Amino acid sequence: AQNESTLEDEDCRTSDWLELFNSTANSINLGGWYLTDDPEEPAKWRLPDLPLDANERTIIFASNQDRTEGELHTDFRLNRNGGYLALIQPDGVTVASSYLYPSQIADISYGTLGLEQSQGSFRNPTPGDPNVAPQGTYLLEKVAFSHESQVITGQLNLTLTTPVPGTTIRYTTDVTSSNPTWRTYNRPISIRETTRVTARLEQAGKEPGPLRDRTFIKLGSGMENVRSNLPLIIVDSFRRNLDGESSANSQNPKRPVHGIFIDVDSDSGLASPTDLPDFEGRGGMRVRGQTSSGFAKKQYSFETWDSEGEDKDVSIFGFPEESDWVIHAPYSDKSLMRNKIVYETSLEMGYPAVRTRFCELYLNTNGGDVSAADYRGVYVFMEKIKRNSDRVNIKQLEKCDNDQPSITGGYIFKKDKGQSVDVTFNTKREGHSLAFVEPDQPTQAQKTWLDSHLDRFEDTLWGSRFDHPTRGYRNFIDVKSFIDTHIWVELYKNIDGYRLSSYFYKDRGRKIVASPVWDYNLSLGNADYLQGEFPNGWYYTQLSSNAYPWYNRLFLDPEFVIQYWDRWFELREGIFDTGAMMARIDNHTAKLNAPARRNFQRWRILGNHLWPNAQVWTPPSPLPGSDRNLAGARNRRSYRDEIDWMKGWLTARLDWIDTQRDNPPVFSRDGGIISGVASLLISNPNTRRGQIYYTTDG
């Protein structure tokens, strides 16, 4: 159940595996029998036709892939922390063989040995062959704790117990050392300050048991009275100064932390540090961001870990289970919401954008109690761009996927500021520097395939018949996604758009999709360069062709242009309607009013110019608060000023883009069921005269 390198399946994955053995002297067929990991669901996974000769063994992968041809794969995985496994007879009820297995150790198999069928572990797994001694040299049981991890306001006495007679409990409270001091437990441990207790069982002649830990976060005076209408995140780094390790040019390792994530109460609508957490547990954390790592208010990468320091998929704030997260810090974005607005509109439009929640963060790095001094402000807790069924849902590329058709996907790649760890390549025709996101370490064959595929795309795009509907560029890209991405960048005038922060994915046998959106904090006027603060003007005209991938040629196709503007006006009647956009901002503002006051008490930046805040443009009248001079960051002295300025900018931007193309004809009535004959008038809403064409051929 913790196969890391023992056995690979046909996909080159080290999936969980189990072995079935016919110990009888006769041939049998297990077709119609069942395997299950749940005693409440005995008929969980039905075995296909499976003949076994006398004393024959067969391997089945517990990978959740549900395959009944070729190598067999169950529709469940095995729990590495211990669980139930059973073989059920064809009646779907009768148990033929079963046992409860304990917590597993990486690449140590667990099973039976000899005629006695004794259960235990094997240092040298033998899939497909008989189990061989020695067996049972590992302690698999875990120490029991009298208390779960929690916040404390006073002293707590922690009792440790062993489920195995004759074993010794050893524990440590050393979190950061690579060579911690282990003590023998003989009396309750008095917890008076923030402490993590890690314990294991030991016994002569056996390897130490698996680690288990509990963490207790001490709240300082007054913290029990904290209330917020946003979720709270409390992180303790065990005296490690995470902010002091920030660097724009390298990725520092994630440091051990403990995180507590508290959602708002469904009845009161508030969250408090003493509330039952939505999730609490071990993790790793570091400062993230190249430019933003230099800001006073840091943003962080956060990873959820198990007791061994390995990735652990969990659900936080109702998001699908994963281990990689981002705690984003709006800083120069004084609206606190630019990224969230873009991510949620993209998600609502059906793209795999990251999910987000506003929250408030407390980060304790000095080793004392968590106090008001540890308040870091309003943050956005969000997902990271990754391949999985709940984020970017594409096939996983394994190291053996080096031939057609498997080599054709799934890839995630980006045009962005590079890190030294990125695997990069350059397109030949337009010369774009791109980097792999998934797989992050592709095989040479995979790297060559994607590079060549994009070269073929560019050759076609710049060919004489590039606009052919089936053999032109449309054969390579999902046109709608490229149009929507262009609209997002231009509508919000994202100064990192096109040239940076541009992500693409390609699933197996599918076209390239321009998505997900990423990093829009320098949008909606929040940039004093490349004309970013002005709501008029196309952003792409500020860029060189190398910074504007593929669109120069795409817009030479009249059909692409027509499709683009049809999409624009379609969105203007829905999600990008001016009233809908203003309502979205107002809803977020109402939720953020009180937290924003606390944020700007912590970070006294209102009325100050932070790079790259807009300095010149001001909203025209009539707008809420338009009697105030909102030009220049120094004149925007309140949170309301920042919101009004952004709303004014967005309104002007929507209006300006509308003027760049004739508006579509207006119908005198909506579609629907009619009785009898109905008249329909079609009129031209534009000031310029023109001919209206229509069709009734749907």
Task: Kindly label every feature range from the protein language model.
Residues 98, 118-122, 128-139, 229-232, ...:
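Middle-to-C-terminal accessory/interaction subdomains
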Residues 1-3, 23-27, 39-41, 63-67, ...:
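Acidic glycine-/aspartate-rich tracts in secreted/extracellular proteins
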Residues 51-54, 60, 104-249, 263-264, ...:
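Short, compositionally stereotyped local motifs that mark structural "simplifiers"
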